[in-house]
Amino acid sequence: LLDSPATGQDKRLPLNGILDRANLAGREAGSAHAEVVEFLSQPGAYPGHPADVQIIESHMSLVFLADDLVYKLKRPIKLDFVDFTAIESRRVSCEREFEINQQLAPGVYLRTLPIVRNSAGSLTLGGEGEVIDWLVVMRRLDSAQALDAQIERGEVRPPDIKQVCEVLARFYLGQTSLDVDPDVMLGRWEEGVRLIENALTDPAFSLPSELIDPPLVSLRRFLANESDLLAARVELGRILEGHGDLKPEHIHLGPPILLIDRLEFDERLRWCDPFDEVTFLGIECARLGAPWIAPQLESGMARLLGERPPEVLLEFYRCYRACLRARLSIEHLRDESPRTPSRWPRQARAYLRLAGESLKNGDQTNGNSSLTGSP
């Protein structure tokens, strides 16, 4: 994992704030989690007793940076799409995360490790005793080499994106097509649009209709009139298990290029058309200030995979992904104790503007779009 937090995470938060959230409402699971967090925040918990332990908090995990290693702890949470309240579910998730990241991030994910209460009642990393939680142990990477950091510094160049495309193409070409019912996939898209619409139009969030309406109308129109294009991708065998969370902060330009944090907790969330996943990455790069990356990703993947979907389908993918990110951003405000609450409406509006741009620009390869151009 990188040695500083990815976009969307809070950097080195005060321990008391993290413990307050871990202990929320005095729940037993929260109390046990708070004990583990306090233990892992101490340098004495780790081999070699590092001088300092830095903590990064995300929605689903806590990451502890200790010298050249990273220790990732799943939070005992229950959401619509995942339930980590049981120790066994966290163990399974840790083991799965270790396994599925070997291909795209070799040498980064080192092992899983139990947190144990020994006979004296003390917590230790490994050893004999009662297992009370699990960690994924990773090699610490240089955050300066992450794609998001390089975008921020203005250092990303077309050859970098070409190499990312080559890594992705090798990965996709090595995957087996999934035997999925087209109606199942269409149902997922329809449900996704329904959830997006419900969230973005919730009066509690006060998102402006001029940002919401055009992309929602476009998404509904596509599903009503062009859904056969989605079914065709299934029938052509283009649906496979992708990365599942292909964000710029998860791409380490190296060398070598490493793609970390492949989504582990639900394989169905990795089911995708490679071009859908790549448009997601392009949208994220555009939000960070590098809109030229999106068309290069799409054209590079088309060249390497030997095909390019119809432009109307790519436009749907772009619009859907931007709207989905807007939905996930604004729904942070539904959390019992949302972190940085002022941030999420701003971020949702930024994604909605990108969704609108994807519609206004049509073919993004024509050189007239704000999503094209070169650095």
List the predicted regions and their residue ranges.
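Intrinsic-disorder-associated interaction segments
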Residues: 8, 26-33, 189, 212, ...
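Short, low-complexity intrinsically disordered segments enriched in A/P/G/S/L with frequent Arg
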Residues: 4-5, 11-13
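Non-catalytic regulatory/interaction regions at protein termini and inter-domain linkers
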Residues: 12-49
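The feature marks either
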Residues: 1
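Intrinsic disorder/low-complexity segments enriched in polar/small residues
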Residues: 10-12, 198, 285, 361, ...
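ATP/Mg2+ or Mg2+-diphosphate-binding catalytic cores
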Residues: 327-371
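P-loop (Walker A) phosphate-binding loop of NTP-binding proteins
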Residues: 374
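Conserved ATP-binding subdomain of kinase catalytic cores across diverse folds
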Residues: 34-235, 239-243, 248-324
